Structures are given as structure tokens and as C-alpha cells.
Amino acid sequence: MRVILQKDVINLGDAGDLKEVADGYARNFLFPKRLAVRANEGNTKAALHQKKLGELKREKRKKAMEDVGGNLNGKEYEILVKTGGGEKLFGAVTPIDVASILKKNGFELDKRKIEIAEPIRNLGSYKIKIRLAEGIQPTITLHVKKEEE
């Protein structure tokens, strides 16, 4: 079945793309979530127009993300955490914690864009990758230090 994507769908395409998908995938997943509509002549013309507008928006968003990425890349941040004696943390530092630190420093990012390679459960310095857009992945350094009581 030919469909026109209304929103970006991971592993399928971007909004405005014309795609061939299985009937069941379209009826059971894409249509109920309003991620796509059935492609017909009228929808196809409208989709081409929408795709052009979407490309302009994506270009603007990519330029904005390049600016943010340039400002973030190589920066160092510090987080104070409680420890259970020695170097072990109570719990772990999560992407939510990193997002809140970045928010305090003027960068509002979704926690899903923050990639922590392995769980941070010890004191020390860690490199954290932030996936802003395709090809834009600044790396920050997070210093995990003991909170003084």
C-alpha cells in the first residue's frame, strides 16, 4: 500500500515522503497513530508541497542544531552525587540528570538525545555524546564528584 507520511517515522522516512508499506503495517500502526495517510492523486500533490515546506524547516532546524552543537562540543560540566562509601554512587547518573544540568546552563535538550555509553555508577570523568541531528553529535565531559555532607 502506498502511503504519505504525515510525521517523521523512525526507520521508514520523513514527513511528506511517499512510501510503499505492508497493508497491515499501514492499517494497524501508521493510520491509527495518524503517522500516515493513504496515497491518492490529491494527497500526493499536497504531500509534495508539504515536503518542500518540511525541507525548509529541516534546514533551519539543522542550522540551529549546528549552532547548539558548536556551543556544546568540548564543554565540561560537573555533577555532585551522594556516594555509599568509596567511589560507588547511590544509583546512577542518567540522561535525565545530564539533561537537567544542560538546562541549567541554557541548553534545553530531550533526554533521548543524550547517549551514555555505560551506566555511570562511579566517581570520575565521563565523555557523553549528544545526538542533536544527523551528523551533529557534540561530546561533553561530565565530572561526577562526591557531594559534601
Swiss-Prot record:
Signal peptide: none annotated. The keyword Ribonucleoprotein applies. It comes from the Bacteria. Keywords: Ribonucleoprotein, Ribosomal protein, RNA-binding, rRNA-binding. It holds the Pfam family Ribosomal_L9_C. GO terms for molecular function: rRNA binding; structural constituent of ribosome. One of its GO terms (biological process) is translation. NCBIfam families: L9. Belongs to the bacterial ribosomal protein bL9 family. The gene is rplI. This is Large ribosomal subunit protein bL9. Binds to the 23S rRNA. Disulfide bonds: none annotated. GO terms for cellular component: ribonucleoprotein complex; ribosome.
